[in-house]
Amino acid sequence: MKINLLARKYFSITLNLLNLAPPFWLKDFRYFVVVDYHYFTDNKISDPTLEVDRLILDKQLEFISNNMNPINPKSFDHKAFFRSKPIKPSILITIDDADFSIKRNLDIFEKYNIPLIIFVPFGLCLAPSTYDGLRSRIFRSFFEIKENQQEVEGDIKFNFFEKIMSSSLEELEEIYIEIKSKRNNKDIISSRTLLNFDELEELSHHPLITISSHSMSHPVLTQVPKKWLMWEITSSMQYLRKVNGDEKYFAYPYGYKGSINGEVKELLRKNGVKYAFSTRSKTVKMNSDFLELGRVG
């Protein structure tokens, strides 16, 4: 908690505390750091681990603009980067969850000409009147029931997935009403207003913005059966292509060590992902695992 608070108030100090700035950068700038934002606000902060005040965001981006080399994901290639000799420390900005607050604060990124990746949980951005929009909200709600966050037998999850995928729209609406009433450990993403599909398509044409996948329903990918996992990845990639997004980037939902394994990484690789991001604090170096890159945030 202390590190997260410092990260949002004293950005440069935090980089030093996490050993993500000098001495590494003073010796060789062929490292870079990836920053992970979630939500922005100009009101009282309710969750200091995920929200950043608009004024603080402005100060952070001003610092980055003056002292660092912001990486443009539209043209990034790690081989070219590590062959180069950057004269400043480099940084890549990412934002998880496609929260509507991005749109309200985009002017600050434009002010400092800072490129960014928005990682989108596509199913939660679809209208709840659509099949995949309803399915994703039901799957999200399933994991907001405490007992389903524990070790649940694979057959239970598999059968639940099969039931949802074979249900009619009317049946899905009834299931959603019922499962919503059972939620007793609601995730913050379910209380946020996310960008809708049309807004994502519009933003994808912005010169500073790259749209990429964050799955469909934002589950811990290692906790779902293989067929469910495949749906989370392949369906999100289909919607990603519809909004002119970039499939080579992906952010793991939650992103802690146990949310990533070889099966998930292999499926991402097969779907064109070259760079996948966790939430673990690590610099990106030439010998990094590019399907398990670290981020600060």
Labelled PLM ranges:
Residues M1-T94, F100-I102, H206, Q223-G297:
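C-terminal active-site subregion of NodB/CE4 polysaccharide deacetylases
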